[in-house]
Amino acid sequence: KMIECARRKGLSLKREAFRESGRKITYYRGVREWFGRINAYGAGRGIDVQHYINSSGIKEILEGTDIAREFKNIYASSFLYDDEGAAYWPAVGVNYTNKTQFIYKINKGVESVSDTKLVNQYLEEEKRPVQFKHMIFIGDGTTDIPCMRLVKSQGGHSIAVYNPAHQGSFE
């Protein structure tokens, strides 16, 4: 439906058009500085801090942001593209259920969004590349709640961010 609607409105569905949209994203105060500060803080304590995006948003838009390079991986919704580079069908659709699976993929070091074998193999917690107790999940929406609960229940930390200027954003 989204693709049909965009075509009717004459909007470009090319990967580069999505990335261009990402270049226009505005951030909460301090987001750009966060990465350098937290990476330096971790390095000073012998910790290799890794950042991931786990979003129900569009991956190609997120890849266009000026902070995309800070992330080891971006788990998000994405499209299939035709020979001219235009989106024609969803490749990955992300909801709160997928997002919890992506947390396990991060936990077990599985980079592929489509892998269902490695993520489901047993691996002792202490052998996992990113243990839950070392995770900090920062979320801003209702699809983040299950991930926040998962990370917190496994010994990690969860932080909810919201814009106080938006009516009802805290509820």
Please report, for each region that a protein language model flagged, where it lies by residue.
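Metal-dependent phosphoesterase signature
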Residues: 2-30
